[in-house]
């Protein structure tokens, strides 16, 4: 009984941590959409926020991972973390450009394909097993297909508005910024970029799991990763904006608030992800993505005066059904493995008796 209670508490910690990170990610996406209308440059935003995040995380290295027995930080591990940083840079750049073209709601809807993509990659890299004789495997495969179909619906079918938001009395958003709406062509471009982002995200989940299996130091890995992203995004920004140095000047308004908020969320986000992927695997990280669309719809309606379109609703529903199918299959698979281990533990006791 005590073991069961302890297990449930442990699961509750993972669940709460992941829900908090997803809420933070959607929140910063919404804030970024507002800040860009006030002149915040993407590369300045990423470079400064990741640099500040690394500085916030630096003190933790002196009293966390140093107290543990860890393998040496070899060139191989550093190379993998550097590659992870490159992947991270690509997915944050494509992701935020995609949000500029579309909306945080679309970004959250399309991110629901991450479990499906991660599952496919996990099979390729032998982190997940598939047997069509087992219901759990069939559920995971069908859920993957359903999620991909849903993502295509969200991107390719805009549809009529099913919910038209209006600014609440206490936020007159039209005075803060121009209307943040997207044309059909922008919606398609944004959807394509966000899909590319989620491919990078899924690959990074797999690589992160590989790194944490050989070097299980969440704070150190997160710090080095964040530093890598800061360097890569800043270098790209210096090249892209070489004729426009004024973009690196940050004003004391919502742009600064966005950068500081992003830094705080980033420093916590990647530590939680590294810690979770070590104990639960890459698919566990990915299955929380569908929940972000519910958060995004509320935040976009309240803060961005965005409307909800039929294509996003239908696609989001299909993706969510696919998500729960994958999650059900994963849960049943873990349950079967636990029963198998328990049976093996009891067998020697019966023989000794």
From Swiss-Prot:
Membrane topology: Multi-pass membrane protein
Any GO CC annotation of this UniProt entry: membrane
UniProt keyword terms in alphabetical order: Membrane, Transmembrane, Transmembrane helix
InterPro entries cross-referenced by the UniProt entry: EamA_dom (IPR000620), WAT1-related (IPR030184)
Residue ranges annotated for the EamA domain, each copy included: 27-155
Transmembrane portions of the chain: 12-32, 43-63, 81-101, 105-125, 137-157, 187-207, 219-239, 252-272, 283-303, 308-328
Subcellular location: Membrane
MF-aspect GO terms: transmembrane transporter activity
Family: Belongs to the drug/metabolite transporter (DMT) superfamily. Plant drug/metabolite exporter (P-DME) (TC 2.A.7.4) family.
UniProt-recorded name of the protein: WAT1-related protein At3g28100
Species of origin: Arabidopsis thaliana
């Amino acid at each position: 009984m005590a073991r069961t209670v302890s297990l449930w508490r442990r699961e509750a910690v993972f669940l709460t941590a992941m829900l908090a990170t997803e809420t933070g990610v959607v929140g910063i996406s919404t804030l970024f959409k507002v800040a860009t209308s006030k002149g915040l440059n993407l590369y300045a935003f990423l470079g400064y926020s990741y640099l500040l995040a690394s500085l916030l995380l630096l003190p933790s290295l002196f009293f966390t991972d140093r107290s543990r027995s860890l393998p040496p930080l070899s060139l191989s591990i550093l190379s993998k973390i550097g590659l992870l940083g490159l992947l991270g840079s690509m997915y944050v750049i494509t992701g935020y450009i995609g949000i500029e073209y579309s909306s945080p709601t679309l970004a959250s809807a399309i991110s629901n394909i991450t479990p499906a993509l991660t599952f496919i990659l996990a099979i390729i890299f032998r982190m997940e097993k598939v047997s069509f004789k087992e219901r759990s495997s069939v559920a995971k495969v069908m859920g993957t297909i359903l999620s991909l179909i849903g993502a295509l619906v969200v991107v390719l079918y805009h549809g009529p508005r099913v919910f038209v938001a209006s600014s609440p009395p206490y936020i007159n958003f039209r005075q803060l910024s121009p209307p943040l709406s997207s044309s059909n062509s922008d919606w398609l471009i944004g959807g394509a970029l966000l899909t590319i982002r989620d491919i990078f995200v899924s690959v990074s989940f797999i690589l992160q799991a590989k790194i944490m299996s050989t070097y299980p130091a969440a704070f150190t890995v997160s710090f080095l990763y964040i530093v890598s992203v800061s360097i890569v995004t800043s270098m790209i920004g210096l090249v892209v904006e070489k004729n426009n140095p004024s973009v690196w000047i940050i004003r004391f308004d919502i742009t600064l608030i966005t950068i500081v908020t992003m830094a705080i969320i980033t420093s916590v986000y990647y530590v939680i992800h590294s810690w979770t992927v070590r104990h639960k695997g890459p698919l566990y990280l990915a299955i929380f993505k569908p929940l972000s669309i519910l958060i995004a719809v509320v935040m976009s309606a309240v803060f961005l005066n965005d409307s909800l379109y039929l294509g996003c609703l239908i696609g989001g529903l299909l993706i969510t059904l696919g998500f729960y199918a994958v999650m059900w299959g994963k849960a049943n698979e873990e349950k079967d493995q636990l029963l198998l281990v328990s049976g093996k533990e009891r067998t020697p006791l019966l023989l000794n008796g």
